């Protein structure tokens, strides 16, 4: 078993282990295709793609598990709750960018105040759009609304 698990780059001081799963080409390819690590994406498009995914999956838990889950307005309240959480997350992302990045000479555009602002704007637009898309799907396709918890 010790032949399979080694220190990452043979450096035991990194605190990371190199396993057959974490260093496989499949895992590296999968992680490199995520918008956080994909090369060539502007911060705005990166935030848009991450926001769409987050907005899309936030509506369901608020709809099915929220306090108004057994009422006629459960879906609408789930959508509005998701948008409220998205606004809170956007404010937190904005605050993080303002206090973390003070130099504009970083080699990665996302590591600057302006780049992080673009990421945050893209996240807001994408997340609200993703929640709206999920709301429209659930409101107009009854089969989807009846799936899951009742």
Swiss-Prot record:
One of its GO terms (biological process) is photosynthesis. It is a multi-pass membrane protein. InterPro entries: PSI_PsaL, PSI_PsaL_sf, PSI_suXI. Residues 94-118 are lumenal. Coiled coil: none annotated. It comes from the Eukaryota. It is found in: Plastid, Chloroplast thylakoid membrane. Belongs to the PsaL family. This is Photosystem I reaction center subunit XI. It comes from Gracilaria tenuistipitata var. liui (Red alga). The lineage of its organism: Eukaryota, Rhodophyta, Florideophyceae, Rhodymeniophycidae, Gracilariales.
């Amino acid at each position: 078993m010790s032949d399979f698990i080694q220190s990452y780059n043979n450096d035991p001081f990194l605190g990371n282990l190199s396993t057959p799963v974490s260093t496989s080409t499949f895992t590296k390819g999968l992680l490199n295709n995520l918008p956080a690590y994909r090369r060539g994406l502007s911060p705005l498009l990166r935030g848009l793609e991450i926001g769409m995914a987050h907005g899309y999956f936030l509506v369901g838990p608020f709809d099915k598990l929220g306090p108004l889950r057994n009422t006629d307005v459960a879906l609408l309240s789930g959508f509005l709750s998701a948008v409220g959480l998205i606004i809170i997350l956007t404010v937190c992302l904005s605050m993080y960018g303002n206090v973390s990045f003070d130099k504009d000479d970083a080699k990665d555009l996302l590591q600057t105040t302006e780049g992080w602002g673009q990421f945050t704007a893209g996240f807001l637009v994408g997340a609200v759009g993703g929640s709206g898309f999920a709301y429209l799907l659930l409101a107009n396709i009854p089969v989807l609304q009846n799936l899951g918890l009742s």
